[in-house]
């Protein structure tokens, strides 16, 4: 049974693990079944880019995007999320420097974090930019 207070934003990393059927993907599946899950629309674009770049058929890409829409609520960018994204980017940038990560966070990462904050949710991910952030449910290494 889903508990309304248990809101989870599923990021690109988590969806890829889910579609790959990995052990981490099994953890994601559990959240999709047991929690109220949300996916920022930017994640749909990132998923499409990844699979198209890897040569997946458009039908496969469409099917995966439909699955995301069936298993979670997709969330667009409104003014609250846009404003929060600006703050979230700076937070992630500072956090990445503390973790001594080579890659800077992207705008997509900021939108994902902002969406979680606006929804008062946690972020389900294994993306290094989110590691050790308070609202992260970590499924990475």
What are these regions (language model features)?
Residues 74-122:
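Active-site neighborhoods of divalent-metal-dependent phosphate/nucleic-acid chemistry enzymes
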Residues 15-16, 44, 82, 130-131:
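A generic structural signal for short hydrophobic patches within well-formed alpha-helices
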Residues 5-6, 34-37, 70-73, 117-122:
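Short active-site oxyanion
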Residues 1-3, 113, 117-141:
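Acidic, PIN/NYN-like endoribonuclease modules and their adjacent C-terminal/linker elements
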Residues 1-40, 50-66:
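Short, well-structured N-terminal submotif of metal-dependent ribonuclease cores
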Residues 10-11, 39-40, 105-106, 127, ...:
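Histidine- and aromatic-rich ligand-binding microenvironments
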Residues 54-58, 92-93, 140-141:
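Short, hinge-like loop/turn segments at secondary-structure boundaries
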């Amino acid at each position: 049974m889903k508990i309304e207070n248990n809101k989870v934003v599923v990021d690109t990393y988590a969806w890829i693990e889910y579609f790959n059927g990995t052990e981490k993907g099994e953890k994601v599946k559990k959240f999709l079944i047991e929690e109220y899950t949300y996916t920022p629309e930017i994640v749909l674009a990132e998923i499409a880019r990844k699979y198209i770049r890897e040569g997946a058929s458009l039908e496969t890409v469409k099917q995966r995007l439909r699955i995301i829409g069936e298993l979670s609520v997709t969330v667009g960018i409104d003014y609250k999320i846009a404003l929060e994204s600006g703050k979230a980017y700076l937070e992630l940038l500072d956090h990445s420097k503390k973790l001594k990560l080579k890659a800077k966070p992207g705008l997509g990462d900021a939108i994902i974090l902002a969406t979680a904050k606006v929804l008062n949710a946690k972020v389900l991910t294994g993306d290094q930019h989110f590691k050790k952030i308070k609202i992260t449910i970590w499924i990475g290494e």
